[in-house]
């Protein structure tokens, strides 16, 4: 047995538990027939003051597979609007809050499980996710982290040796348990549940807790409540813009899946765009397309409006309306800035009308171009040359005879003319900065569905984890290299 488990000696704080029994239920973790550590996110350990070299695989398994040494384990209570219909029959159905630890940066972080067994909110389910679902979450969260999108992360993924039967993937399939590393698991739906039971006192208690814990810069401000909601609106608008620029479709933007700190979490049937299709819907069960790609900003704003109902028990309507009023402008400004970065430019380099025109022209091109959304930006990164500034014909020359030959020439030429015009308006000294920006904003490969399957199939067929490790390594060493967990294919 390795030395004292560092996860069990962390200075856990009972921040959420201190709210009392109205907010959660104590539960017991499931036991599993086997434990194989498949992924450990060593990048997160220094945030906790831990040296990855001193943390053994068995430490992960003991803490996050056998769940030894922690009590209480809390299933959090919440409600939510699911596909527009209010559901009071929700809560942590296959996970719990393992503990909360303050990082070296002073922030409080949650260890939240997924797949740790039944709770009072399992609604007849077995409380266990598939291994493929765990691998998909690793891919989504690490890629979004690579892009600079606010996201929870996977701290560990452990295969648990059971066979599961699921209707949405070939069965029997393999089981897993995951520990997520998030700023918080408090959701819009956490507040909605309190309104459902007409508990204004608990809304006040929870709001005070959220401000003190996650918006502490507002403590002591007489307008803290109003400023909290306005800042949450900004964070949520920023998050929606980050998703849209990344070509990411969350798939299930119910109010119980939106974080009170504006962080991506609760990954389900997510997908990244292959071809640019604004009406793309990621979830096979979203028959109406409610949560399709193009709807995400509007849904985020709608969910903020729904959050006004419980917050309105302790806040004025005027403060709430003022807080959400800036959503559209904030979203558009962030989206434009991020899209310009994907094209190699900073917003302050260009007049806003010129910048917007380039973005619109790019999206119009991608609507008809036989090329993937993220592939377009990756190719722009790979082929950009400073010579484009002086030679219009040098801009992506191979496209004319290959991918773009099916496009009307005027459409392709229109995009190329605009891009060239912007280059000529910039000093030549800024061209290397464009190359740097393109590299930072555009990974060489994105986890579109064929890529996900190319990673999963070797695992499913041959227990071969090398393709997953190779893909994570590409993101790890590409651009800023933000994604850097470690695949552990043969841990016992």
UniProtKB/Swiss-Prot annotation:
EC number(s) per UniProt? 2.7.7.-, 2.7.7.108
Catalytic-site annotation from UniProt? 256
Quote the record's binding site residues for ATP: 91, 93-94, 114, 126-127, 180, 187, 266
Q: Which cofactor does it need?
A: Mg(2+); Mn(2+)
Q: Name one GO molecular function term.
A: AMPylase activity
Task: Name the catalysed reactions.
Answer: L-seryl-[protein] + ATP = 3-O-(5'-adenylyl)-L-seryl-[protein] + diphosphate; L-threonyl-[protein] + ATP = 3-O-(5'-adenylyl)-L-threonyl-[protein] + diphosphate; L-tyrosyl-[protein] + ATP = O-(5'-adenylyl)-L-tyrosyl-[protein] + diphosphate; L-histidyl-[protein] + UTP = N(tele)-(5'-uridylyl)-L-histidyl-[protein] + diphosphate
InterPro entries per record? SelO
Keyword terms: ATP-binding, Magnesium, Manganese, Metal-binding, Nucleotide-binding, Nucleotidyltransferase, Transferase
- Identify the Pfam families for this entry: SelO
Annotated binding of Mg(2+), by residue:
257, 266
Task: Kindly give the HAMAP family that the UniProt entry links to this protein.
Answer: YdiU_SelO
As for what it does, the entry says: Nucleotidyltransferase involved in the post-translational modification of proteins. It can catalyze the addition of adenosine monophosphate (AMP) or uridine monophosphate (UMP) to a protein, resulting in modifications known as AMPylation and UMPylation.
Assigned protein family: Belongs to the SELO family.
In Swiss-Prot or TrEMBL terms, this protein is called Protein nucleotidyltransferase YdiU
- Please name the source species: Synechococcus sp. (strain ATCC 27144 / PCC 6301 / SAUG 1402/1) (Anacystis nidulans)
């Amino acid at each position: 047995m390795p030395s004292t488990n560092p996860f069990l000696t962390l200075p856990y704080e009972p921040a959420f538990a201190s709210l009392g029994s109205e907010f959660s239920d104590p539960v017991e973790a499931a036991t599993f027939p086997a434990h194989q550590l498949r992924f450990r996110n060593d990048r997160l350990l220094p945030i906790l003051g831990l040296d990855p070299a001193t943390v053994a695989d068995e430490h992960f398994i003991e803490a996050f597979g056998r769940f030894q040494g922690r009590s209480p384990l809390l299933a959090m209570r919440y409600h939510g609007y699911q596909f527009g219909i209010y559901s009071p029959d929700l809560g942590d159905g296959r996970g719990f809050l393992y503990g909360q630890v303050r990082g070296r940066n002073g922030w409080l972080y949650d260890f939240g499980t997924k797949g740790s067994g039944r709770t009072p909110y399992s609604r007849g389910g077995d409380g266990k996710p598939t291994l493929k679902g765990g691998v998909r979450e690793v891919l989504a969260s690490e890629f979004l982290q690579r892009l600079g999108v606010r996201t929870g992360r996977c701290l560990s993924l452990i295969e648990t040796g059971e066979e599961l039967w699921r209707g949405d993937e070939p069965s029997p399939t393999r089981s897993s348990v995951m520990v997520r590393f998030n700023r918080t698991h408090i959701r819009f739906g956490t507040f909605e549940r309190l309104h459902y039971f007409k508990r204004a006192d608990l809304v006040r208690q929870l709001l005070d807790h959220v401000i003190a814990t996650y918006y502490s810069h507002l403590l002591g401000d007489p307008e803290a409540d109003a400023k909290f909601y306005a800042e949450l609106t900004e964070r949520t608008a920023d998050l929606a813009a980050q998703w849209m620029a990344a070509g990411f479709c969350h798939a299930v933007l119910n109010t119980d899946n939106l974080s009170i700190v504006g962080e991506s979490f609760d990954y389900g049937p997510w997908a990244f765009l292959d071809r640019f299709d604004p009406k793309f819907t990621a979830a096979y069960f979203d028959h109406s397309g409610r949560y399709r790609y193009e709807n995400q900003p509007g849904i985020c704003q709608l969910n903020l409006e729904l959050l006004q109902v419980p917050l309105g028990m302790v806040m004025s309507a005027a403060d709430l309306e003022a807080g959400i009023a800036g959503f559209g402008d904030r979203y558009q400004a962030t989206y434009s800035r991020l899209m310009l970065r994907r094209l190699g430019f900073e917003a302050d380099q260009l007049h806003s009308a010129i910048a917007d025109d380039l973005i619109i022209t790019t999206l119009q091109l991608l609507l008809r171009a036989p090329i993937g959304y993220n592939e377009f930006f990756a190719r722009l990164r790979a082929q950009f040359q400073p010579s484009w500034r002086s030679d219009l014909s040098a801009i992506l020359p191979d496209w004319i005879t290959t991918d773009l030959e099916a496009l009307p020439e005027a459409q392709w030429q229109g995009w190329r003319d605009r891009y060239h015009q912007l280059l000529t308006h910039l000093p030549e000294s800024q061209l290397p900065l464009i190359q740097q920006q393109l590299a930072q904003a555009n990974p060489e490969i994105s986890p579109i569905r064929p890529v996900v399957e190319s990673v999963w199939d070797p695992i499913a067929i041959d227990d071969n984890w090398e393709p997953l490790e190779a893909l994570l390594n590409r993101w790890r060493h590409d651009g800023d290299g933000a994604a850097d967990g470690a695949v552990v294919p043969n841990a016992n």
